[in-house]
């Protein structure tokens, strides 16, 4: 395999040079033996994607189904109920047991992720808990060697506000210790009086 990284930060395109969800190895899309998609950080930022359901609506081969207050993803006729974070699975609601574990809509804000890898089709050969429909893997941002900081603010109708701050860099002169912090604050109103929600996320 080519010695390449799966990270998409500072990559100004909507394409990634590699992904690892299929085999656990950083393979280029051409080397990957399955149908795959990658939602890069550039696309997340350019299109203002803030949650997993919105990202999956923009992903080829994935159908987003919302019913009774829950969100589920469908791929090749099967529900994808194992959503990975850095390659580690987290069960969402509607799994084989039928127990409501976690709604996919409630997954962490996408501002903390570098990219989202999507594999269409079974991955059980390389992952013990693979599903026939496919696998979704959200890869988190990592600390950088060089200092960098960014902040953004958005405003919309019905008192909708969103603020994101991201700071990263080395913590010592030898650059052997690094850190990163991402903070998000969301506030959403409604056309109805006294209806709204406010949420915050901190990652570091």
Residue ranges and their predicted role:
Residues 98, 102, 111-114, 120, ...:
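Outer-membrane beta-barrel translocator/receptor signature
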């Amino acid at each position: 395999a080519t010695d390449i990284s799966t990270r998409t930060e500072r990559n100004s395109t909507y394409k990634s040079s590699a992904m690892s969800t299929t085999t656990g190895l950083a393979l280029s899309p051409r080397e990957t033996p399955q149908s795959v998609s990658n939602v890069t950080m550039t696309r997340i930022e350019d299109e203002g994607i803030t949650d997993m359901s919105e990202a999956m609506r923009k992903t080829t081969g994935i159908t987003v189904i919302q019913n009774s207050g829950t969100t589920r993803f469908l791929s090749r006729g099967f529900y994808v109920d194992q959503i990975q974070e850095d390659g580690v699975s987290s069960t969402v609601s509607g799994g084989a047991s039928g127990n409501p574990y976690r709604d996919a809509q409630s997954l962490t804000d996408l501002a903390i992720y570098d990219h989202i890898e999507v594999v269409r089709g079974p991955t059980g050969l390389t992952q013990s808990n693979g599903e026939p429909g496919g696998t979704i893997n959200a890869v988190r941002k990592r600390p950088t060697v060089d200092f960098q900081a960014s902040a953004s603010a958005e405003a919309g109708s019905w008192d909708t506000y969103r603020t994101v701050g991201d700071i990263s860099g080395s913590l010592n002169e030898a650059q052997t210790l690094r850190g990163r912090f991402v903070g998000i604050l969301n506030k959403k109103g409604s056309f109805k009086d006294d209806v709204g929600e406010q949420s915050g996320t901190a990652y570091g």
